[in-house]
């Protein structure tokens, strides 16, 4: 999982920076980074718990299917949220660099196909039902939407209490 999610993470180095962040210098503060981690970590944790509950219910005690569903969901959310949190703008208003977008798409597709391959079976992954895949994709979209909707209020809150959010 970590190796695959590292590919889009490495590609972030090729990413575009929003024009607003190039025009004027900005200051980073550890407190602001900590607050970001707390807020978005809580959003992530809520969806992790939802995923665990759904997978527990949908896989009915099939440990391998649960593990595979978790593998797919955790990888999809990890690479998907990168496209959301890489910018303060709405994700669709800030185009990612081609390398970042391609790496993210390839890893997402690969994560969903891997359980049906010999390589996937080496890692204990098993094919899962369409219902499990649908649930994973719905959780993914819910998580990305929640993260996107959290950004605006978070950055407004940060701007009120910190000069780090202002140019």
Task: State what each model feature region is.
Residues 1-167:
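C-terminal transmembrane helices and immediately adjacent loops/tails
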